[in-house]
């Protein structure tokens, strides 16, 4: 089972990552945390997750035996659901390799199996980097090329643990009313959960992560896509393997909420992309929808004059907000039957773009993918009538995942990018409610 792999005993050097195989257990860890698996009768399950950051008091999570390491829910061609439980799979072999700089990768290769007329191959992968207080877990899933159209993922549960009573836990509050017109459900997506001074989450911003009744953990990624669709989107490797988003398990120094959040944000700092401070002018604050070429040019000049006189460097972008599209009162002018420029901009945006660059700055542009905020219902119907999009009947706006709409929007972006040298896009509003089924 463990042929071809070398398993080191717990490292003498504190910072070294180790993978141990002792009797019926396999453990991966470092000085901050560890995860131990019971491997018996070709079955694998997590038997302990350990937090070593709390000083002398080591904190351990011992999942109930009914817990799973993952559940994959699939959909057949006629939408019949069926689940693949990690506990139902048989282990073929375990592999340990180096990962990155002084990191380790632990892979549980399961034996292939047939499920809903599809031949599946699933691997569970864990990675741990040197000096990090968190580790990652993800799946690699493969099906034959000829069966991709049959293999459809409904969702994946990454950590379906059942917890013993009395554990210190936190999950997001119920926010039924939402904020600012956005539902509480959407706002809560992507939040971590805290268990015994450890944080758990998925590196996907719209994951459904929560603890039900203080006992049942859910870290769920909804897909709804077949492997054929994933291949068309470039989500499969050359080998045909789909690599899921990565689940993260992190150790903190206390069960105190402030400390947990501090250590969680330390992880966020590690993965975040640096954001540079930008100075911009946006036409919305002066004119809202009442922009035209003349008042835009006047504003650009006035802003530049005032800032220069006060020693401010050239700003990063002059941005034209809503009011340029041929919809609402200007829809009859719309010959493109798509996003296009109304008669208030006879030169489209060439003149404002040219001025922004002559002011030693750059040009930015607004677009609301779901149809903006004032004329979205009528505009969505207009696009659908002309074969350039689809009305989302559940939210009375544009379906932002419609293939024709997305392709035409991409071409519009590229055209504006080239002709107006856009360096900043304000993409305003993507989704209110999922659309009706086709």
Language model features with spans:
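Aromatic- and acidic-residue-enriched carbohydrate-binding clefts of CAZyme catalytic domains
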Residues: 274-277, 317-319, 323-352, 376-404, ...
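Active-site-adjacent "subsite" loops/lids of carbohydrate-active enzymes
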Residues: 277-278, 285-289, 293-294, 362-420
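Bacterial Sec-dependent N-terminal signal peptides
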Residues: 1-15
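Acidic-aromatic substrate-binding/catalytic surfaces of carbohydrate-active enzymes
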Residues: 23-116
């Amino acid at each position: 089972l463990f042929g071809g792999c070398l398993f080191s005993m717990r490292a003498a050097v504190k910072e070294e990552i180790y993978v141990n195989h002792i009797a019926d257990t396999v453990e991966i860890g470092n000085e901050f945390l560890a995860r131990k698996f019971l491997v018996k009768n070709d079955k694998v399950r997590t038997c302990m997750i350990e937090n070593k950051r709390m000083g002398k008091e080591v904190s351990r999570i011992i999942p109930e035996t009914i817990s799973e390491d993952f559940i994959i829910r699939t959909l057949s061609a006629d939408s019949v659901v069926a689940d693949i439980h990690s506990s139902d799979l048989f282990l073929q072999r375990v592999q340990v390799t180096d990962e990155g700089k002084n990191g380790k990768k632990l892979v549980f290769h399961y034996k292939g199996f047939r499920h809903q007329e599809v031949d599946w191959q699933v691997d569970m992968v864990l990675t741990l980097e040197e000096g990090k207080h968190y580790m990652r877990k993800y799946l690699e899933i493969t099906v034959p090329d000829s069966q991709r159209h049959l293999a459809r993922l409904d969702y994946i549960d990454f950590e379906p643990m059942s917890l013993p009573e009395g554990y210190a836990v936190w999950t997001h509050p119920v926010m039924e009313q939402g904020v600012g017109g956005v539902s509480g459900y959407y706002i809560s997506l992507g939040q971590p959960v805290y268990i015994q001074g450890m944080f758990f989450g998925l590196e996907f911003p719209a994951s459904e992560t929560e603890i039900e009744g203080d006992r049942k953990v859910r870290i769920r990624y909804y897909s709804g896509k077949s492997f054929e669709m994933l291949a068309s989107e470039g989500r499969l490797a050359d080998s045909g393997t789909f690599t899921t988003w990565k689940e993260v398990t992190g150790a903190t120094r206390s069960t105190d909420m402030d400390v947990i959040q501090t250590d969680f944000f330390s992880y966020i700092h590690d993965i975040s992309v640096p954001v540079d401070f930008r100075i911009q002018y946006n036409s919305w604050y002066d004119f809202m929808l009442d922009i035209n070429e003349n008042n835009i040019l006047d504003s650009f000049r006035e802003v530049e004059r005032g800032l220069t006189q006060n020693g401010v460097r050239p700003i990063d972008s002059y941005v034209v907000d809503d009011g340029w599209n041929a919809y609402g009162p200007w829809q009859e002018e719309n010959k493109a039957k798509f996003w296009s420029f109304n008669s208030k901009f006879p030169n489209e945006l060439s003149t404002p773009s040219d001025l922004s660059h002559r002011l030693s700055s750059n040009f930015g542009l607004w677009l609301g993918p779901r149809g903006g905020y004032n004329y979205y219902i009528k505009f969505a119907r207009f696009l659908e009538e002309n074969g350039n999009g689809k009305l989302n009947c559940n939210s009375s706006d544009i379906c932002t995942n419609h293939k024709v709409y997305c392709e035409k929007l991409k071409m519009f972006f590229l055209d504006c990018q080239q002709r107006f040298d856009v360096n900043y896009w304000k993409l305003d509003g993507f989704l209110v409610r999922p659309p009706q089924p086709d």
